């Protein structure tokens, strides 16, 4: 007897519907075909134990199972459930044709309980696309899978539950989640707020500009000056996630297995802060079964690299292409996996190895050569992709105790959203830009767009030229200054880029100054 069940293979964010064919004949062996990896091949032992421990007898026949299409590699343990149901159906335990209408995924424990799998959300999207009536998943994955509308999603605890449901037990009901209500309720619940930060108004302004234009930013200052504290509050002033952005971000976290049992849609922009000992694979993604790295987990959010020069040079250099393309392609011998990674890079660093170069309260013990070597750990091409360089000094305790609470994040966020709306309207008529997709903020402008949208007047251009000569700014700083100036103008509600906007943008290019290591902060 030949039986078919349906499941899915997840490669990156791409999902392929897999047909699980089970056939029985005389014999006592189990054969599994269809380019299955080790975890899938081991499924027979789990299935056998699960069937026996749930009161079923393993058929004493030759069982052949095929996972089609055979040219796509099948990885993970999510094929246990469809294989087990196929064996039960081929053995006459299924009394209906409901197997044809439902996709199912799940790992089986030896006791027959369903264990959670990765990628439940993209699998649910694929099930709806293929017009299945419903999807059966482990109960732990129910909230993320139930996000998909027009699809009946059932969360099951055991193999017996699945069999009873397929045989027509009507006591099982699909899970329904009010996605929009939950999404909007949680959007403004931030752990940190800028009102908690006293002082550092110039740095707050730089972060506001960065948030308004999607600019990458690096903060340079001594230990204890508040770099990490300020960075953690950046998500509270970024524009809220749209539902489309949230769905894309949630899919990435679903594939990586990072969603908690209570999560349906990610409602706030991700903030990822990996340790400086992180490896290349952990940062950009990879492995035998390529998983998303930190840059993809930060998609539509913030990647914070604390003590940036402490990361190995090779790790830093792999950031260059993702920062430009906003996606990462992981190549393997027989296939490629692509993950999106459109994130804001926020970095921090000390000004020197000891950390106190230019600090008024501590003496620096580093030589100019040591300082220069420390700064050179960040290459020119990588620094070229960071629009805003912001210097920061620690606020003395005597001043801290006298300062009033800072401006709340909600007020700053309103200005940021207004500036982003201006940019959205500006770029809405432009076609997609190659691999980067559609431009949606000033940081992504090309040279042609700079001439069209950020061309300064003659007086501003003369001031910029003079500043570049006197401050020894590099040539690569020119377009970065114009992009940041365009954002500052948007925050001010100005259609044109004026001298005051250029002047502020010039102040954000400290590390491009040729005399930086000799002058002190």
Segments predicted by a language model, with ranges:
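P-loop NTPase nucleotide-binding/switch module
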Residues: 170-209, 213, 240-295
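Walker A/P-loop
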Residues: 219-260, 325
């Amino acid at each position: 007897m030949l039986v078919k069940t349906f499941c899915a293979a997840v490669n990156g964010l791409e999902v392929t519907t897999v047909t699980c064919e089970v056939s029985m004949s005389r014999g006592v062996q189990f054969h599994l075909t269809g380019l299955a990896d080790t975890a899938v091949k081991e499924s027979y032992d789990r299935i056998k134990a699960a069937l026996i421990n749930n009161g079923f007898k393993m058929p004493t026949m030759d069982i052949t199972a095929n996972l089609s299409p055979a040219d796509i590699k099948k990885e993970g343990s999510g094929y246990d459930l469809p294989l087990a149901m196929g064996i039960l159906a081929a053995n006459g335990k299924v009394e209906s044709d409901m197997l044809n209408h439902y996709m199912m995924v799940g790992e089986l424990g030896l006791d027959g309980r369903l264990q959670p799998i990765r990628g439940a959300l993209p699998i649910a999207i694929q099930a709806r696309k293929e017009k299945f009536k419903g999807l059966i998943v482990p109960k732990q994955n129910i909230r993320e899978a139930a996000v998909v509308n027009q699809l009946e999603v059932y969360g099951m605890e055991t193999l017996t539950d699945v069999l009873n449901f397929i045989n027509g037990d009507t006591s099982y009901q699909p899970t329904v989640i009010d996605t929009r209500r939950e999404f909007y309720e949680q959007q403004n619940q931030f752990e940190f707020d800028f009102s908690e930060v006293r002082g550092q108004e110039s740095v707050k302004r730089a972060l506001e500009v960065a948030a308004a234009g999607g600019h990458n930013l690096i903060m340079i200052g001594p230990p204890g000056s508040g770099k990490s504290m300020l960075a953690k509050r950046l998500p509270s002033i970024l524009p809220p996630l749209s539902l489309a952005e949230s769905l894309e971000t949630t899919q990435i976290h679903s594939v990586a297995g990072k969603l908690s049992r209570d999560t349906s849609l990610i409602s706030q922009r991700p903030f990822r802060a990996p340790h400086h000992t992180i490896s290349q694979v952990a940062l950009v993604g990879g492995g035998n079964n390529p998983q998303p790295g930190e840059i993809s987990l930060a998609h539509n959010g913030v990647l914070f690299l604390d003590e940036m020069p402490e990361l190995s040079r090779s790790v830093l250099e792999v950031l260059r292409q993702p920062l430009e393309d906003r996606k990462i392609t992981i190549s393997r011998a027989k296939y490629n996996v692509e993950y999106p990674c459109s994130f804001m890079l926020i970095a921090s660093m000390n000004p020197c190895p000891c950390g106190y170069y230019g600090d008024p309260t501590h003496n620096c013990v580093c030589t100019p050569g040591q300082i220069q070597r420390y700064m050179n750990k960040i290459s020119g091409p990588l620094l070229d992709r960071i629009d805003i360089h912001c210097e920061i000094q620690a606020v003395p305790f005597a001043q801290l105790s006298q300062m009033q609470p800072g401006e709340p994040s909600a007020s700053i966020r309103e200005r940021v959203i207004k500036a982003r709306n201006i940019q959205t309207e500006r770029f809405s008529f432009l076609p997609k830009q190659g691999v980067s997709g559609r431009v949606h903020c000033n940081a992504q402008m090309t040279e042609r767009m700079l001439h069209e949208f950020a061309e300064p007047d003659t007086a501003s251009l003369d001031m910029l030229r003079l500043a570049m000569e006197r401050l020894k700014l590099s040539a690569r700083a020119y377009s970065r200054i114009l992009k940041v100036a365009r954002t500052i103008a948007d925050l001010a509600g100005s259609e044109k880029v004026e001298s005051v906007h250029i002047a502020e943008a010039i102040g954000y290019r400290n590390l491009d100054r040729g005399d930086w290591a000799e002058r002190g902060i």
